[in-house]
Curated annotation (Swiss-Prot):
It comes from Cucumis sativus. GO terms for molecular function: chlorophyll binding; electron transporter, transferring electrons within the cyclic electron transport pathway of photosynthesis activity; metal ion binding. The modification N-acetylthreonine is found at T15. The gene is psbC. This is Photosystem II CP43 reaction center protein. [CaMn4O5] cluster binds at E367.
Length: 473
């Protein structure tokens, strides 16, 4: 396969101190890459690169299956999922598998099936990865031109982009079909404390769906993370799936316009940087979703959100003190504000005390006690149900705080369990991974732009200042 650039000009060189090191007959001088840039071997070997990608997919799916079975093997039905450090079973439960009213697990067999299916799939992918890495053709262009490509071929690149978009769109519709036709999904807002239900009355109004994108990202608004009913979530997947599929067809059928050809860098490393940037955005959005949203990530499985645990504590002590004779409507706290109830900046009745900062929390166990002007005093006096008390007491002692040594919960809470909430794990890991992916995006974007501009990044090591300085010792 002919490469359209000379390698020396096309690839920016990272100059090492020991640029003469040769591994497996490859050295930096002839390849333009140092020994540690292993993937660079595959840049123009589409068959081998396919093998690397398929094998990587196999590793990912193997982890999913093995970890899934590990969680099933360790699962104790009598304890909530979030007390057991589970991160995969909550996702399956949220999709409506194996759970009943109140999020109670009634059948673990679907979880077992999921794990086995992923393990079997990973074996197929692993075989394909090894085959293409070791036995298959090094390049696909000659034998399988449909699957072959040259990184500079803009039309082919947008065709590949289109195929990926269609696959993502199909993925979005899988959730829609599960919610509509295949048993429904878990709705934490179902009356009486959550249940699995089919989502029939989808929100398809563009003003509602795209209105989320126009919201402020700050408190009370919360951008797309503020979504709090499944009709909007599933309807959003209809819109997203449709846009992805139509956009995919568009990119397959068209060639890039002149402005896009000029504006973008068209090289393998540039595409890598675009992908890392996109994954970084996904990571940051996922972080915010799992930390703040208790509809897409129901508290029955993931534990309460931070604001939810705080409000649950205020509610629990309001219930206790009201039983002991306190007048919750008029009791004053140490600051002169209401001890149990006060008003928000916009006039709603909210919980008093330190939890006032979380006054815009919405949670299924609390909403029935609200009226048109916030918390309703008469409902708080007469209508609190036992399930609401039980759930808030449970959430109060399971705040999503905690450190790596698993001493979780609130430090001052004597009844707390030593655990780290899955919300803490998932939010932290996705933030950290999103950050690293962003750094990788900047790194590869800088290299790709430098290569396209025709210059090499880096200092000429022969004249590096440190070589002319007095040794420290």
């Amino acid at each position: 396969m002919k490469t359209l650039y000379s390698l020396r000009r096309f690839y920016p060189v990272e100059t090492l101190f020991n640029g003469t090191l040769a591994l497996a007959g490859r050295d930096q001088e002839t390849t333009g890459f140092a020994w540690w840039a292993g993937n660079a071997r595959l840049i123009n070997l589409s068959g081998k690169l396919l093998g690397a990608h398929v094998a990587h997919a196999g590793l990912i799916v193997f982890w999913a299956g093995a970890m899934n079975l590990f969680e099933v093997a360790h699962f104790v039905p009598e304890k909530p999922m979030y007390e057991q450090g589970l991160i995969l079973l909550p996702h399956l439960a949220t999709l409506g598998w194996g759970v009943g009213p109140g999020g109670e697990v009634i059948d673990t067999f679907p979880y077992f099936v999921s794990g086995v299916l992923h393990l079997i799939s990973s074996a197929v992918l692993g075989f394909g990865g090894i085959y293409h890495a070791l036995l298959g053709p090094e390049t696909l262009e000659e034998s399988f031109p449909f699957f072959g490509y040259v990184w500079k071929d803009r039309n082919k690149m947008t065709t590949i982009l289109g195929i990926h978009l269609i696959l993502l769109g199909i993925g979005a519709f899988l959730l829609v079909f599960k919610a509509l036709y295949f048993g429904g999904v878990y709705d934490t807002w179902a009356p009486g404390g959550g249940d699995v239900r089919k989502i029939t009355n989808l929100t398809l109004s563009p003003s509602v769906i795209f209105g989320y994108l126009l919201k402020s990202p700050f408190g009370g608004e919360g951008w797309i993370v503020s979504v709090d009913d499944l009709e909007d979530i599933v309807g959003g997947h209809v819109w997203l799936g449709s846009i992805c599929i139509l956009g995919g067809i568009w990119h397959i059928l068209t060639k890039p316009f002149a402005w896009a050809r000029r504006a973008l860098v068209w090289s393998g490393e540039a595409y890598l940087s675009y992908s890392l940037g996109a994954l970084s955005v996904f990571g940051f959005i996922a972080c915010c979703f799992v930390w703040f949203n208790n509809t897409a990530y129901p508290s029955e499985f993931y534990g309460p959100t931070g604001p939810e645990a705080s409000q649950a504590q205020a509610f629990t002590f309001l219930v206790r003190d009201q039983r002991l004779g306190a007048n919750i409507g008029s009791a004053q706290g140490p600051t002169g504000l209401g001890k149990y109830l006060m008003r928000s900046p916009t006039g709603e009745v909210i919980f008093g005390g330190e939890t006032m900062r979380f006054w815009d929390l919405r949670a299924p166990w609390l909403e029935p006690l609200r009226g048109p002007n916030g918390l309703d005093l008469s409902r708080l006096k007469k209508d609190i149900q036992p399930w609401q008390e039980r759930r808030s007491a449970e959430y109060m002692t399971h705040a999503p705080l905690g450190s790596l040594n698993s001493v979780g919960g609130v430090a001052t809470e004597i009844n707390a369990v030593n655990y780290v909430s899955p919300r803490s794990w998932l939010a932290t890991s996705h933030f950290v991974l999103g950050f690293f992916l962003f750094v990788g995006h900047l790194w590869h974007a800088g290299r790709a732009r430098a290569a396209a501009a025709g210059f090499e990044k880096g200092i000429d090591r022969d004249f590096e200042p440190v070589l002319f300085m007095t040794p420290l010792n």
